Amino acid sequence: MFKTGRVFLLILSYIISASHSFSQEKSSPFSFNGYLVTMESAIFDSLSGPVLFDNVLHNRLNFKYYVQDHITLAAEFRNRLFTGDMARMGNAYSEMIDADEGIADLSWNIIEKNSFFLNTTIDRLYADFNFKKFQARIGRQRINWGQALVWNPNDIFNAYSFFDIDYIERPGSDAVRLQYYPSPSSVIELAVKGDRDNDLTAAALFRFNKWGYDIQFLTGYSNSSDLTAGAGWSGSLGPFSFRGEATWFHPLKEFSNTTGTMILTAGVDRIFKDNSMAQVQLMYCN
C-alpha cells in the first residue's frame, strides 16, 4: 500500500516538469529544475528469434535550498514509468529496479500492474557545507573519482555501467565526503561510504595538475574486503585527449598472497569541429 500524498506529488511533478524546467531567481533561496525523456528499447539474441519491446518514461526533479552562503540542502528524484514486455514477465524485473544498495532504502515501486509499474528513487539527498578552502558533504551523493570515459577502476564508490545511457547523473552513495583545496588546481579528499549489507568503503585521494595533466593518486579500503591503491590521469596528447586509470585490489583475507588484482584502462578521444566525437579505450585485468 502507498500513500495518496506521495502519488499526488509525483503526478503534480510530472505535469510541472513536462511543461517546462526552470530555476528560481538568484535572490530566492530555493531552486528547482528537471526534465522528461522517453526511451524505447528492443531486446533480442538473434535476428530470427523473438524480440522484446520496452519503454521507459523518465522524469527527473532536482530541488536545492540555499540555507546560507555556506550551507546547501539538496534532494533529487528519479521517477520512471516502465511499460512493455519485460514489465509483463513477472515481479523479477520490478524488484530489480526497486533494489536500493544504500544504507537507507530510498526506492519505491509506487504502482505495480500486470503491464507497467512506476518507480521513484531519491538518488541525491545531502547537506553541503563549504567555507574557504574546505568543503564537507553528508548524505546520498555522487563521488566521482573517474578520469576515463568508459571504464573507471578509480571510481570505487559509484561503479556503474557505461551502457546505462539514460542515467547521465549516475548513481549516488550514502557517504561522508571531506574536501580541502590547497590551491585552485589541487584537492585532497577523504570519503567514507556504507551500504545495505553493512560493507564499508573508505579512501583518500590527492589530485593535482602537472605538465598540463590532471593527475591523481588514491588509497583505501573497498567493500570491507580489499585494500585498494590507484592512480589516474587526463590531459592532451596532440589533438587528442589522453585519459587513463589503474587500480589495484588486494583481499585482506589473502594478505600473504602478493598478487592481488590490477585493473588498468587507457584511451584517447577527440571532439571535431562539428561537435562529433571519436574515442577508443582499452582495459587490462590480470
List the predicted regions and their residue ranges.
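Outer membrane beta-barrel
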Residues: K64-S186
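Flexible, surface-exposed loop regions and adjacent strand-edge segments
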Residues: P50-F53, M89-D98, N154-N158, H250, ...
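Signature for the C-terminal beta-barrel architecture of outer-membrane proteins
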Residues: F32, K132-K133, A159-N286
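Bacterial N-terminal signal peptides
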Residues: L9-A18
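Transmembrane beta-strand segments of Gram-negative outer membrane beta-barrel proteins
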Residues: Q24-L47, A75, S186
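Bacterial N-terminal signal peptides that target proteins for export
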Residues: M1-F8
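Outer-membrane beta-barrel biogenesis signature
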Residues: S21-N33, A87-Y93, D226
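Outer-membrane beta-barrel proteins
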Residues: I43-L47, G84-R88, W145-V150, D199-T201, ...
